[in-house]
Amino acid sequence: MVKTNTNKLTDDQISEIKESFDMFKSDNGKLDNDQIKYAFKALGCEITEETLELIKKKGQKSISFNSFFELVSPYIPKRDSMSTLEQAFKLFVKDGSGITFKDLKKVAINIGEECSDSDLYDMIEFADTDGDGVINKSEFISLMTTKKVL
């Protein structure tokens, strides 16, 4: 159970935090520093290097959901939904041109997600509405803001 005052957060925001944590956590059920960065970015937030250093100084190599929740919850009410989606898009692609198979595979490997190449291609095909083999920013935003089911 989360120990913080969640009055400022909606149920959807709390669910988002949990989903982000679950997406990036290791087999031990915790996030290491790299996974913390990815989970923050997926939520449209940036964690400072100072905060990561504080975690290290406390001797923590990884953090639990409750610790992650405590870290990220102050950032959530301040987010702009469009900038959140843009941050999430940037998780996948550095140059802004679009998410390719290679980008998607790299993120899957970085977060420890085992996906077959076929599954990754299916994901791209599902979101790629213009058929160019790349998920551009508008396709990504459309995917993330509509309730489609694979």
Curated annotation (Swiss-Prot):
Location relative to the cell: Cytoplasm, Cytoskeleton, Microtubule organizing center, Centrosome
Molecular function terms, GO-annotated: calcium ion binding
One record GO biological process: microtubule nucleation
InterPro entries: Centrin_CML-like, EF-hand-dom_pair, EF_Hand_1_Ca_BS, EF_hand_dom
Binding positions for Ca(2+) per the UniProt entry: 128, 130, 132, 139
Record keywords, A-Z: Calcium, Cell cycle, Cell division, Cytoplasm, Cytoskeleton, Metal-binding, Mitosis, Repeat
Domain EF-hand: 12-46, 80-114, 115-150
Pfam families xref list: EF-hand_8 (PF13833)
Keyword Repeat: yes
GO cellular component terms attached to this protein's record: centriole; centrosome; cytoplasm; nuclear envelope; nucleoplasm; nucleus
PANTHER family named among the record's database cross-references: CALCIUM BINDING PROTEIN
Family: Belongs to the centrin family.
Other known facts: Binds one mole of calcium per mole of protein.
Known role: Plays a fundamental role in microtubule-organizing center structure and function.
Name of protein: Centrin-B
Gene name of the record: cenB
